[in-house]
Amino acid sequence: MRLCLFLCLVLLGPRMATLRRSQKKKIQEVPPAVTTAPPGSRDFVFDLYRALAAAAPAQNIFFSPLSITVSLAMLSLGAQSNTKAQILEGLGIGPGEGSEEELHSASQRLLRELQQPQDSLQLSLGNALFTKPRLPIQEAFLGAMRTLYLADTFPTNFEDPEGAKKKINDYVAKQTKGKIVDLIKSLDGTQVMVMVNYIFFKAKWETSFNLKSTHEQDFYVTPETVVRVPMMKQQDQFYYLLDRNLSCKVVGVPYQGNATAFFILPREGEMEQVENGLKEKTLKKWLRMPMKRRLELYLPKFSIEGSYQLEEVLPKLGIRDIFTSDADLTGISNHSSIRVSEMVHKAVVEVDESGTQAAAATGMVITFKSARLGSQRIVFNRPFLVLIVKNSKHILFLGKVTRP
């Protein structure tokens, strides 16, 4: 995998502000647990995936569970009353599911862990607040953002929309090594705060695919729609699991630096069954039980991106008030008439023979059994799922490749 970038952008403005529709997409030990982000967020992640898939059933999907959950956790710091309750319940924080304090402390540990320098991969992630200078921000909120979420803060004159847009876009471009430019298409001067969460990850395959083995082959978008794609080929030992319950094959292709990309190939016609089966226990099974065996693997090179207006999706998962006049964000500011006017999530991924630039995270190591079996041929020539995991416990990306 070569390139994957992610940004989650949250714009706060007056409650009466009009929603923008830019960038709209119709929508080696066994670890003790698999996590997508802070505790309690796993069901939310898979429910979010299904909501995105339902909105665009024949489209590519790619997003970062980590960044979305961290962004919502940050918002919960400043939310009050029912607004806070909706966010926490959406993330799975409720009776018997952990506390808000555990959510934020786990987020802090995660961010510090992921920012540890590593020789074999590049990782950059963080948070930033761009705030209107005269907006009275609660000191408790600013302090928590800096200490728990390691956020940078920048006073920004939103009354100069073009200047504010340039300032934010320049920051984003710098943090993503120039891979995402012009994230913000327009500002109208009504914004009082912009929250940005970014992640940039770059890693190489543990064993690169041979360029000379890549050839054009058919990819069946549907049984009736066939496109030609460059298909990579490699014979090697890969992590492998045949999941008979969900009628799919799972292949793990490792990166240098203790990260792995898992590719899930449903049996023909069974994609919906696999999507409906995405749960925490399913991921645990895939990560704990695969065998390492020799495969003749055919995997298409692909480049896809996802751009989502989360203010259109999250209400379907119970997180509604922050986008309406009912929003209570008085934990951010005593200015009572602010709400989230737009929440943009953007991710891009490119897969090729050498490796991946992607949004990412870090963690523990998986122990895999090694099977003495003959080489098996697996061809990813129809829609499949992909997830990127760091150290076997942080699920960084989740997506579906329908058309490479």
UniProtKB/Swiss-Prot annotation:
InterPro entries: Serpin_CS, Serpin_dom, Serpin_fam, Serpin_sf, Serpin_sf_1, Serpin_sf_2
Family under the similarity heading: Belongs to the serpin family.
Location in or out of the cell: Secreted, Extracellular space
Record note on domains: The reactive center loop (RCL) extends out from the body of the protein and directs binding to the target protease. The protease cleaves the serpin at the reactive site within the RCL, establishing a covalent linkage between the carboxyl group of the serpin reactive site and the serine hydroxyl of the protease. The resulting inactive serpin-protease complex is highly stable.
PTM comment, free text: N-glycosylated; glycans consist of a mixture of sialylated bi- (including sialyl-Lewis X epitopes), tri- and tetra-antennary complex-type chains; affects the maximal heparin- and thrombomodulin-enhanced rates of thrombin inhibition. O-glycosylated; further modified with 2 sialic acid residues. Proteolytically cleaved at the N-terminus; inhibits slightly the heparin- and thrombomodulin-enhanced rates of thrombin inhibition. N- and O-glycosylated. Proteolytically cleaved. Inhibition of proteases is accompanied by formation of a stable enzyme-inhibitor complex and by degradation of the serpin to lower molecular weight derivatives.
Main localization, broad class: secreted
Stretch forming the signal peptide: 1-19
Gene3D superfamilies: Alpha-1-antitrypsin, domain 1 (2.30.39.10), Antithrombin, subunit I, domain 2 (3.30.497.10)
CC terms in the record's Gene Ontology section: acrosomal membrane; extracellular space; platelet alpha granule; platelet dense tubular network; protein C inhibitor-coagulation factor V complex; protein C inhibitor-coagulation factor Xa complex; protein C inhibitor-coagulation factor XI complex; protein C inhibitor-KLK3 complex
CDD domains the record matches: serpinA5_PCI
Record carries keyword Transport: yes
One Pfam entry name: Serpin
Primary role: Heparin-dependent serine protease inhibitor acting in body fluids and secretions. Inactivates serine proteases by binding irreversibly to their serine activation site. Involved in the regulation of intravascular and extravascular proteolytic activities. Plays hemostatic roles in the blood plasma. Acts as a procoagulant and pro-inflammatory factor by inhibiting the anticoagulant activated protein C factor as well as the generation of activated protein C factor by the thrombin/thrombomodulin complex.
Expressed in which tissues: Expressed strongly in the liver, and moderately in the kidney and testis, but not in other tissues tested.
Cystine bridges: none
Pro-sequence residue ranges: 20-24
Protein name: Plasma serine protease inhibitor
Site (Reactive bond): K369, S370
Gene (UniProt): SERPINA5
Lineage start: Eukaryota, Metazoa, Chordata, Craniata, Vertebrata
